[in-house]
């Protein structure tokens, strides 16, 4: 039995848009019966230009010099992801 599903986003994340809400809308269209118990992002990896600033669950994060940010699986429930300015990013997430 699968322990989760992956989703991805590549493109420009619009400033002020909650990307987790956007991911949920996409997942609802694809896996609605599976998501009857709720949508929780348990892992996320983001790559983009170094210095891109975003909030994750209300906490400010700045992409480091590598341009890569990643959480460990199941360490936190990711409820919101909002970029301060529009930024071209690649996001891989597990829910």
What are these regions (language model features)?
Residues 3, 7, 12, 34, ...:
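Compositionally biased, low-complexity repeat tracts
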Residues 45-48, 82-86:
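Non-cytosolic beta-sheet module surface loops
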Residues 28-37, 61-79, 92-95:
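Beta-sandwich interaction modules
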Residues 20-53:
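Beta-rich globular "head" domains
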Residues 1-31, 84-95:
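C-terminal interaction-tip segments
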